[in-house]
Amino acid sequence: MEKIPMTGAGFVALEEELRFRQQVERPRIISAISEARAHGDLSENAEYHAAKELQSLNEGRIAELEDKISRAEVIDVSKLSGDIVKFGATVTLVDEDTEEERVWQIVGDSEADAKAGRISISSPVARALIGKKKGSSVEVVTPKGARSFEIVEVRWA
């Protein structure tokens, strides 16, 4: 079974979503199915079929969350240090063409949110940064083309 690296915050978020889906969504959906079933003929009961579809989607997501949680390798970023980029690092980059500064934290796949400054360990940018030191220049091939960045800071939250 392949381990899934994630931060403590990412692990907590998965646990919270699992709890919500099991303790709030599941009972709500079961209630909706019961209510729709009370309306009679199930073959033409759109409410019933919609609730059953929701149930299927919710149970599928619960199974996915349970799998991710069971395979999670929680990495305590606060115990990491150094100036080499690795999982959990918050990296400040400067685009060598535009001089634009960007800050990214390298996190697990399920935690990634580019708008919030968190990129997946498997993203092209993170793969290019891993193992590089502060002061290094890296070239990243993205869907928008090749970009060159200088690593100006590596910190650990």
Swiss-Prot record:
Signal peptide: none annotated. It comes from the Bacteria. One of its GO terms (biological process) is DNA-templated transcription elongation. The keyword Acetylation does not apply. The keyword DNA-binding applies. InterPro entries: GreA/GreB_C_sf, TF_GreA/GreB_CS, Tscrpt_elong_fac_GreA, Tscrpt_elong_fac_GreA/B, Tscrpt_elong_fac_GreA/B_C, Tscrpt_elong_fac_GreA/B_fam, Tscrpt_elong_fac_GreA/B_N, Tscrpt_elong_fac_GreA/B_N_sf. Keywords: DNA-binding, Transcription, Transcription regulation. GO terms for molecular function: DNA binding; RNA polymerase binding. Belongs to the GreA/GreB family. HAMAP family: GreA_GreB (MF_00105). Necessary for efficient RNA polymerase transcription elongation past template-encoded arresting sites. The arresting sites in DNA have the property of trapping a certain fraction of elongating RNA polymerases that pass through, resulting in locked ternary complexes. Cleavage of the nascent transcript by cleavage factors such as GreA or GreB allows the resumption of elongation from the new 3'terminus. GreA releases sequences of 2 to 3 nucleotides. This is Transcription elongation factor GreA. It comes from Azorhizobium caulinodans (strain ATCC 43989 / DSM 5975 / JCM 20966 / LMG 6465 / NBRC 14845 / NCIMB 13405 / ORS 571).
